[in-house]
């Protein structure tokens, strides 16, 4: 499917991210199972929305994490199947774009608000051997090097 791109956009602000994140998962699973895409970029907003609205210490935030974990589990299962059935190598990367204040929101320059993480998990291949401290501007090059 070279030179073909598919973009799925759902309006979480209108319909809520519980619904939209699930629809994004369904579309991503379909893409992985049926379209054979080499790269999928999937964005779930439910955790970010819960952090803004309720802070990171409440039940709403934990529930949002559990929902996104279930979505990621579905994607992981599809990638495991592809690796097993087709001998494919996949790299599942999870990243946040920022942290939150305990009481909710972000936008400041505190260490807590600037905190982020990257998790890279090899499927049908080894995990990448990246440094524990990755500067945000280095991530693109690390990802591209994995395709070499």
Residue map of PLM features:
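Feature captures the catalytic ectodomains and active-site-proximal regions of enzymes
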Residues: 1-148
């Amino acid at each position: 499917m070279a030179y073909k791109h598919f973009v799925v956009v759902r309006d979480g602000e209108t319909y809520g991210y519980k619904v939209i994140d699930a629809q994004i998962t369904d579309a991503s699973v379909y893409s992985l199972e049926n379209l054979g895409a080499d790269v999928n970029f999937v964005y779930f907003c439910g955790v970010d929305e819960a952090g803004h609205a309720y802070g990171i210490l409440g039940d709403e935030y934990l529930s949002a994490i559990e929902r996104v974990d279930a979505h990621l589990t579905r994607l992981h299962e599809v990638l495991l199947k592809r690796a097993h059935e087709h001998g494919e190598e996949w790299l599942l990367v999870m990243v946040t774009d920022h942290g939150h204040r305990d009481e909710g929101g972000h936008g400041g320059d505190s260490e807590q608000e600037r905190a982020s993480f990257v998790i890279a998990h090899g499927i049908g291949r080894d995990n990448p051997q990246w440094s524990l401290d990755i500067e945000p501007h280095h991530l693109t090059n690390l990802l591209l090097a994995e395709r070499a």
